[in-house]
């Protein structure tokens, strides 16, 4: 991999299984080098006749924390995220996402293009883009409703809060939880699936969206929830419109196109810039220099306004 790209993917082989490890510390965002590495090594595994399955995981304590928002609005080298994810989704060999920690935003969207998903008991998944004035723009609004149903998907995306592995398993976001060695369990799980003639793609799971077609309550309840919890925000309405497309469009790619259009509208909306500014500001404030780590938190009992005239 070229050193000019940010982040990388490590490639190793265990028997007939190729292991792709996203390595972009500290939280493994989907930076340019990661996207390039995914595209390169998915292709390599598919071209190797000795490889029968692929495991995608993350280095350290995070699977993939999401998109690299520092690249938003900037030209970057390497394949775009949609291209890299499409390579995974249409892999000739089955792909399992071994979620070793945090899988948020683009991280969960990456797991959703894999055929199977397994997490540790401490894994965290979620689509928090709404908190940045955005919507899940890498297929999350189209795949998640197909996997767990439009109603649950809307609640998850509008809340923007992380979900535990236990709840993710209950709702069907992941297929299994590893209680021991994630890699050992992932290899064993995938070995059982290798002999299957077909390996499910989330994009092809239409039963739940077809069940919601014609049920006005699904979208009405989501709009009521957004009005209550996200009053005045732009992105929630766009998320609902995306899921409406997932429900009503017969062609998955048409829904994806609408998601891209609505994502761009969110990206250009002033709210997005303000909310991302707040996000970076809060992160910076939490890392104020010269404050000892042992400094205790103190309650605020009163506050005064200075310079009010």
Task: Describe each PLM feature range.
Residues 1-57, 79, 83-86:
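Conserved CoA-thioester-binding segment of acyl-CoA-metabolizing enzymes
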Residues 2-21, 65, 109, 113, ...:
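Amphipathic alpha-helical segments at domain termini/boundaries
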Residues 57-87, 103, 131-134:
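Glycine- (often His-adjacent) and acidic-residue-rich active-site loop
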Residues 88-132, 136, 307:
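Glycine-rich beta-to-alpha active-site loop
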Residues 141-151:
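Hydrophobic, secondary-structure "cap" segments at the distal end of domains
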Residues 296, 301-309:
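Glycine-rich adenosine-cofactor-binding loop
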């Amino acid at each position: 991999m070229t050193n000019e790209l940010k982040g990388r993917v490590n490639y190793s082989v265990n028997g007939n299984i190729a292991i792709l490890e996203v390595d972009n510390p500290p939280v493994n965002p989907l930076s340019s080098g990661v996207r390039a590495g995914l595209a390169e090594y998915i292709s390599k595994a598919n071209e190797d006749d000795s490889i029968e399955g692929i495991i995608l995981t993350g280095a350290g304590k995070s699977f993939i924390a999401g998109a690299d928002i520092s690249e938003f609005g900037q030209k970057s080298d390497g394949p775009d995220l949609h291209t890299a994810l499409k390579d995974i989704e249409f892999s000739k060999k089955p792909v399992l996402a071994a979620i070793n920690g945090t899988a948020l935003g683009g991280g969960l969207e990456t797991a959703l293009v894999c055929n199977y998903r397994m997490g540790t008991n401490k894994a965290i998944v979620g689509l928090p883009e709404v908190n940045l004035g955005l919507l899940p723009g890498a297929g999350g609004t189209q795949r998640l409703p197909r996997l767990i149903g439009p109603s649950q998907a809307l609640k998850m995306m509008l809340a923007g809060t992380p979900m535990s592995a236990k709840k993710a398993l209950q709702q069907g976001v992941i297929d299994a939880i590893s209680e021991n060695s994630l890699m050992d369990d992932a290899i064993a799980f995938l070995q059982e699936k290798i002999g299957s003639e077909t390996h499910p793609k989330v994009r092809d799971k239409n039963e739940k969206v077809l069940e919601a077609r014609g049920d006005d309550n699904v979208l009405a309840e989501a709009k009521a929830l957004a009005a209550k919890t996200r009053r005045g925000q732009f992105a929630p309405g766009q998320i609902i419109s995306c899921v409406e497309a997932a429900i009503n469009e017969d062609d998955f790619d048409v829904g994806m196109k609408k998601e891209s259009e609505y994502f761009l509208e969110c990206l250009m909306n002033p709210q997005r810039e303000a909310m991302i500014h707040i996000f970076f500001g809060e992160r910076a404030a939490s890392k104020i220099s010269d404050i000892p780590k042992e400094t205790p938190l103190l309650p605020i009992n009163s506050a005064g306004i200075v310079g009010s005239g």
